[in-house]
Amino acid sequence: MTLLAGFKVVQIGGGSAAAVCGRLMADVGAQVTCIDPDAGTTLLAYLNRGKAVAATATDRHASLAAADLIVREGPPKEWAASPYVLPELRRINASATVVTLSPYGATGPRANDPATDLTLFFASGISRQLLGQVDDLSEAPIRPVGEQSAFIGGLAAACAGMHASLGNQPGASIDVSIHEALSTLAMTELARAGLGHKSWDRKRLGDGNGATVTILPASDGYTAISPREEKQWTSWLKAMDSPAWGNDPRFVPKANRVKNWDALHALMSHWSRLHDKQWIADTAQREHVPSFPLREVSEHLDTPQLRHRGYYRPSDLAGKTIQVPSTPFGLSVAAGRKQDAAKGPLPLSGMRVLDFSWVIAGPTTTRYLAAMGAEVIKVEAPGSGDPGRATELHTVLGQAKKSIVLDLKKPQAVELARALAAKSDILVENYATGVMDRLGLGAEALKAVNPALIYISASGMGRTGPEARAVAYGTLLQCYAGFAGLNRHPDIAPRVGFAWCDPMCGLMLAFVAAAALRHRQHEGGVARVDFSMIEAMLWTMAEPLVATQLGTPPKPVGNASTRHAPHGVWRCAGDDDWISVVVRSDAEWRALCGVVPGLAGMAALDLGQRIEAKDAIDATLTAWAVTRAASTAADSLLSAGIPAAALARYGDLVKSPHLAAREFWDEHGAGVLPGLPWRASFGRATGPAPDLGADSDQVLTNVLGLSQERIAELRTSGALG
């Protein structure tokens, strides 16, 4: 059963991010019709497969008039000359949600700057962090594999558009910035910069986070491990057959492992090179230590886990039948009653979310739900609560939520949780498989107290299949999926890198939650969602998955491109300052030659000739860039119409006139915190993140109707921590 049966989407133009938005909608059952689609690349052909095309003026008008959601992509100047300007779309259909995607948003001084995947990753700051910390700053920053700016932008558009389409916001308009969608993946770093705290440095300091998660060489590749807790470290030593150095005081406790990381990694590597990557991961998992092998994308095309979950479906592409991803979640839908849309100023006004999630992925999901107006009640354990509280993570992801402390080891606390679930619309949890069931808070158990509850579970591998109980973290899953292995320069070993998987999954989950609400409203069905983070990773890695099956398996290429030349990054004057430059056409090449004097004699070169002359072009751009400030160099190229961007630091984004003009930042005490990657005509909810348990009494009184005397009894019993 699909979530969006009867939901009609019109996708206008050839933009990749709009195509991703339409692909996600189609994968969960929407009827997607394209106007002027582009199938010029394998990725676009994949994204637009199976969608209807409105080829005539009559068909286009009819599709637009019937649409629930219209999505289009491009900077404002492109739409000004288009027949699909907003007033015309409103004349045809006054009630549809219209989502406009663009590189830098529809407003602000950078709104019409030319941009590409590479330059957006530079401008967002994500390229500075993607590889993690490096030993040598001469190693160039890179973009990730597979046009990921389109996937992140498309997910943001789908999330915002789905919420706006829930029924209480007819005629909503949404402006999605791909630049902001990328930047907001790094919530912790944005918050640190906004609050004036110490910011992240690309130069490796200490262990470079290795004591938390690292990659070890194996006899046939690499394996990622994450024995971040002392208990896990003890188990990891057992998995390595209790080496003599395991009791060395240099490596106990974790603070000492951080301090002596290079020596420790060398010792572990000596052991790991004797074993194959899957054996290491299996041995670690048997000891409940999070670990996965670094796989090639091709290794995921036929696995017992994905077969069990029916993840792939056949599709014809480029004259060949290949396997393509389906939805990254299992879905069961129980019959129920149709429910009216929320009433209030925001899409989720009046909706209650019971939030059992922690750290990044789940709290990112509920951050979006809170911003869209839901009352989010965050259930935390006594003591320190969500580990995200130890950093700025909770400060930003906890915004506009409520916090209640429940000690779920106490039966009375479990009963309180059940009572709250009985009065909630959505439950979100990302505990290890089996935990909620053992507590009596699983989907089946709560169905008895609230048949209308939408129950969303997120886990590394999904709740079913032979790997369902594997211990996983998002950073390990991006290694397992093949993402980390491809995101590197050809001559450099893979790194874990930036925690990409978790915030990406959180964004996708927020879309799924809104889609499930719409299904409950229109069909009466109540969804049980079993979300798999590895499947979500592979869904966004469609380009390498498809290329592998069409005979061109991807390899690590750094910033190289076969479609554009030049396409790369060059070091500028200053401390670890870089510029990215992309030339997409002969006209842009001639413009570049007009800015960089040393290229003037090459102005007549076409694409093939520029690829052949790569070394000479690189040398000229290297000499030109190294004497200039990155921002100055980028501005000179942008003024000539050439996509370019300086490698942003998060502090640069805090000071950005463009983001200020777009009101991206929210005031927070003496600093600022990042907002959402879209501007909606209906706005969003704001508010500070709660202290641990700050709302316990209020929630128990207002939601459950408990007296102060009863609350005092529960607190004395330990149920409230």
Name these PLM-found stretches.
Residues 124-145, 481-497:
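The feature captures the short pre-catalytic strand/loop hairpin that immediately precedes
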Residues 138-149, 217-220, 491-501, 572-576, ...:
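Flexible glycine/proline-enriched surface loops and loop-helix/loop-strand junctions
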Residues 1-41, 55-107, 130, 134, ...:
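Acyl-CoA thioester-binding alpha/beta core of soluble enzymes
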Residues 14, 147-150, 358-359, 409, ...:
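Alpha-helix N-cap/helix-initiation motif
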Residues 84-93, 97-118, 123, 441-450, ...:
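Rossmann-fold NAD(P)-binding glycine/threonine-rich loop
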Residues 45-56, 393-408, 479:
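N-terminal glycine-rich dinucleotide-binding loop that anchors FAD/FMN and/or NAD(P) in oxidoreductases
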Residues 116-126, 150-154, 471-482, 501-509:
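Active-site PLP attachment segment
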